[in-house]
């Protein structure tokens, strides 16, 4: 085992900045400030890994250092399997993680292959090397809670209490996103180290293991109308039950535990983290049974809060499906966050555009933020987000920024970043990527594509087409994964990263990739019949051959 740190500075050890960018983002994924369990190559989300094992990690490193600027490395589930000569505008790396033939696309078969060292769970940005810590999800979480506030609480979360669980790499964004919307958050996690990490990075305000103290603090902050986040150490099922018994009013209920993975992501009721680890290794079958039974109880408690007046939504971890499979027939009585709050943004090709400064210099991100303000002065949501981010976001690993931008905006920003690198206003190349959770890059019937207007929730073609078009357009590294977010059998999704190194070649590639990528989001929603997407496509001149047949489904 090695201790990995994000590499910074202007000297490179690869044969070009593009290969160097891949290496630095791989290191960044495993930086101790960023990854959840770097010693096990686990970045976030249960067992979402950056490489299959340490031997494969070192082979990836070596290959990247030797890779020519007209070659492409192929990575199969975290292991480098081939290098081929391609051309300078082709991707330097193509990645496929955790992809199983549908009949075998389940956790049991995955775990068998994993034990044999034949596969790796890449989550979304873990195995595609573009994870930037909790900031990567915090704006999406902020926008979700902002829209919830607009729909249910007169535009703001002041005077409300949200109860949730899970403070890992994804769930860790919740406390900050809620307080950014002036709400009070009680965030439960059985693993105290996770609470400590969110306190250390200033995503969470206070830690306690005492429920009465947590409720008192929450009530006082609610009465003052102030934002406050409380990391409450304990088991979610136990604590949710106790809160119901005390009759404490919860206004919003959700969950972001790693429920997508019953074996590695969720701790059953009645077990400490240490006890769970022992049982997981000793009797994995029993562990999964207990874990799923706890999830069923967890969802029943969420439904009870909902019945008592709380706004309830699923935050994309597939916990409703597990509960439904274990006898909770009304598990889907509350919606997922995408159909409830996010889909209109997807129809415009908006999604989690992100970039990282390979120099390691925060001033490069400051200059990029300044440029973003100049380019989009009319985008009030974006400007408000940048104000909050500059005030409240602590960088983890390489300095980075997340900013939800739409079709046209992403290409405009990418070209501007390339120009700033070329002119020396930004000191080193910038890596531009996104989460796989995006407008046109994922098929996930219990999350991103839940309740599609035309019933096409489970159609996986769009994620495949996204990876193909971004490869054709010349992304720097392109990935295709299975099972991210919601677990084996429930999702297919693609990722892209493109490097702005200041060159004319980068300019061509940026313009293509940052147009095709969000364009796929618009196309996907046009095809499903969404009027906002149809209007966007017509206004932006996106060529959709059968657009006049859309919108009548």
Swiss-Prot record:
Primary residence: cytoplasm
Q: Which HAMAP family match?
A: HutU
Q: For this protein, what is the EC number?
A: 4.2.1.49
Entry binding sites for NAD(+)? 45-46, 123, 169-171, 189, 194, 235-236, 256-260, 266-267, 315, 485
Q: Where in the cell is it found?
A: Cytoplasm
What cofactor does this one take? NAD(+)
Q: Name one GO biological process term.
A: L-histidine catabolic process to glutamate and formate
Enzyme type, top EC level: lyase
User: What pathway does this protein act in?
Assistant: Amino-acid degradation; L-histidine degradation into L-glutamate; N-formimidoyl-L-glutamate from L-histidine: step 2/3
Question: Which InterPro entries did the record assign?
Answer: Urocanase, Urocanase-like, Urocanase_C, Urocanase_central_sf, Urocanase_CS, Urocanase_N, Urocanase_Rossmann-like, Urocanase_sf
What does the record give under GO molecular function?
Answer: urocanate hydratase activity
Cofactor annotation remark:
Binds 1 NAD(+) per subunit.
Instruction: Name the reaction it catalyses.
Output: 4-imidazolone-5-propanoate = trans-urocanate + H2O
Instruction: Give the protein's function.
Output: Catalyzes the conversion of urocanate to 4-imidazolone-5-propionate.
GO CC list: cytoplasm
* Annotated family: Belongs to the urocanase family.
Q: Which PANTHER family match?
A: UROCANATE HYDRATASE
Protein name (Swiss-Prot/TrEMBL):
Urocanate hydratase
The signal peptide, as residue positions, is: none
**Keywords for this protein:** Cytoplasm, Histidine metabolism, Lyase, NAD
């Amino acid at each position: 085992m090695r201790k990995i740190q994000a590499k910074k500075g202007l000297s490179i050890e690869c044969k070009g900045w593009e290969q160097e960018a891949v290496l630095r983002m791989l290191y960044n994924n495993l930086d101790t400030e960023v990854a959840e369990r770097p010693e096990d190559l686990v970045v976030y989300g249960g067992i979402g890994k950056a490489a299959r094992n340490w031997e494969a990690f070192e082979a990836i490193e070596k290959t990247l250092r030797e890779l020519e600027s007209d070659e492409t490395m192929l990575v199969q589930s975290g292991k480098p399997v081939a290098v081929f000569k391609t051309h300078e505008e082709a991707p330097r790396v193509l990645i496929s993680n955790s992809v199983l033939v549908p009949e075998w696309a389940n956790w049991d078969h995955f775990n068998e292959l994993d034990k044999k060292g034949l596969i790796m769970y890449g989550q979304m940005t873990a195995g595609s090397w573009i994870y930037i810590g909790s900031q990567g999800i915090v704006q999406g979480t902020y926008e979700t809670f902002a829209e919830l506030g607009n729909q249910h609480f007169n535009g703001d979360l002041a005077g409300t209490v949200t109860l949730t669980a899970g403070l890992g790499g994804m769930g860790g964004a919740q406390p900050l996103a809620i307080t950014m919307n002036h709400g009070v958050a009680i965030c439960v996690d059985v693993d105290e180290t996770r609470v400590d990490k969110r306190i250390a990075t200033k995503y969470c305000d206070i830690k306690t293991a005492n429920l009465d103290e947590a409720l008192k603090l929450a009530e006082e902050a609610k009465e003052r109308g102030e934002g406050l986040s409380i990391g409450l150490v304990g088991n979610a099922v136990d604590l949710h039950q106790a809160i119901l018994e005390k009759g404490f009013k919860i206004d919003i209920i959700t969950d972001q535990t790693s429920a997508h993975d019953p074996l590695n992501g969720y701790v059953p009721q009645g077990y400490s983290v240490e006890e769970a680890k022992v049982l997981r290794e000793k009797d994995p079958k029993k562990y999964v049974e207990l874990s799923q039974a706890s999830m069923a109880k967890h969802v029943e408690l969420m439904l009870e809060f909902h019945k008592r007046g709380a706004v309830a939504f699923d935050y994309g971890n597939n916990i409703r499906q597990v509960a439904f499979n274990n006898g909770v027939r009304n598990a889907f009585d509350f919606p997922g966050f995408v159909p409830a709050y996010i889909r209109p943004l997807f129809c415009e090709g908006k999604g989690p555009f992100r970039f990282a400064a390979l120099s390691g210099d925060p001033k490069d991100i400051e200059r990029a933020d300044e440029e973003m303000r100049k380019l989009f002065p009319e985008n009030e949501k974006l400007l408000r987000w940048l104000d909050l981010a500059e005030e409240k976001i602590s960088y983890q690993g390489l300095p980075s920024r997340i900013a939800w931008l739409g079709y046209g905006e992403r290409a405009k920003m990418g070209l501007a970043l390339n120009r700033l690198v070329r002119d020396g206003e930004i000191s080193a190349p910038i890596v531009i990527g996104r989460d796989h959770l995006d407008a046109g890059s994922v098929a996930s019937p219990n999350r991103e594509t839940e309740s599609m207007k035309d019933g096409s929730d489970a159609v996986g073609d769009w994620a495949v087409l996204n990876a193909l078009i971004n490869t054709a357009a010349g992304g720097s590294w392109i990935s295709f994964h299975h099972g991210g977010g919601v677990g084996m059998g429930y999702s297919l999704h693609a990722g892209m990263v493109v490097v702005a190194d200041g060159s004319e070649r980068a300019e061509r590639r940026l313009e293509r990739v940052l147009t095709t990528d969000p364009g796929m989001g618009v196309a996907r929603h046009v095809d499903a019949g969404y009027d906002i997407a149809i209007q966007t496509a017509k206004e932006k001149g996106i060529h959709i051959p059968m657009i006049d047949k859309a919108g009548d489904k």
